[in-house]
From Swiss-Prot:
Transmembrane segments: none annotated. Belongs to the UPF0342 family. This is UPF0342 protein LSEI_1724. InterPro entries: Com_YlbF (IPR010368), YheA/YmcA-like_dom_sf (IPR023378). It holds the Pfam family Com_YlbF.
Amino acid sequence: MANVYDTANQMAADIKTTQEFQDLKKAFDLLKLDTVAYGLFQQFQQKQYEMQQKSMQGQDFTDDEVKSLQELGDKMRGIQPIQNLMAKEQGLSQMMDELNKIISQPIIDVYQGK
C-alpha cells in the first residue's frame, strides 16, 4: 500500500521545480525589491487576513473595511510588479486546480458508483 503522505511530500517538492512555481517565486522576489509596491502588498495581505478572521468568527464587515480593502486593491492594480505577481499566481493556481481534480477523482468515482 502506498504511503499517500510520502507521495504528497514528493508532490510538494516537485511543485517547487515547475515553471509556474519558479515564475511565481521570481515575481515575488522582484516585488520585494520595490519597497512601495511591497508595502502595499503587505498592507493588503494584513487587511485580507483581518477580514478572514472576522468572517470565521461570524462577524460582519463594516462598509469602511470593505471600502478600505477595495481602495487598496485599486492602488495595487496600477503597479506593474503586483500585476506581474498576480498573473503568476493565476498560472500556479490553474496548475493546482488541475492537480486537485486528479487527486479528488477517486472520491468523485465513489459517489458516481464507479
